[in-house]
Amino acid sequence: MRSFEFFEHTADVGIRAYGKSLEEAFSNAALGVFEVITDTSKVKPIEYREIYLNGYDLENLLYKWIEELLYYYDSELMVFSKFDLMIDQDSMTLEGKAWGEKFNGKIHERRTVVKAMTYHQLSIEKTENGYVITFVVDI
């Protein structure tokens, strides 16, 4: 199963992420976002940021997850390549760690700045193979 792919969207970037579990799909969604920003294969999981989020549904939880990661990019220039998380669908909570390092122009390719997560075309679908998450980020 592929982890994520991009799809065409006027002036923004569409991402479709896959996972056998919801956690894997959320992780791959985040990886897709950071692949827009830089080549994540060159991002070493040196530091981590702990993340605790509450949402009112899965879509809101995904929105907050991506926004939280973008906050760390905007405020600390952190880029991430590895994610360990747990999602409790009963309480609609996410907790985990995002692993990466500070962006370094000598090591990391500067691609496109992701301004924000959006609710545009946001969907989380359970399939026979796991989960498919579709969303658009503002660039």
Swiss-Prot record:
GO terms for molecular function: calcium ion binding. Coiled coil: none annotated. Pfam families: Archease. The keyword Calcium applies. Ca(2+) binds at D12, D138, I139. The keyword Ligase does not apply. Keywords: Calcium, Metal-binding, tRNA processing. One of its GO terms (biological process) is tRNA splicing, via endonucleolytic cleavage and ligation. Belongs to the archease family. Activates the tRNA-splicing ligase complex by facilitating the enzymatic turnover of catalytic subunit RtcB. Acts by promoting the guanylylation of RtcB, a key intermediate step in tRNA ligation. Can also alter the NTP specificity of RtcB such that ATP, dGTP or ITP is used efficiently. NCBIfam families: PRK00407.1. This is Protein archease. The lineage of its organism: Archaea, Thermoproteota, Thermoprotei, Sulfolobales, Sulfolobaceae.
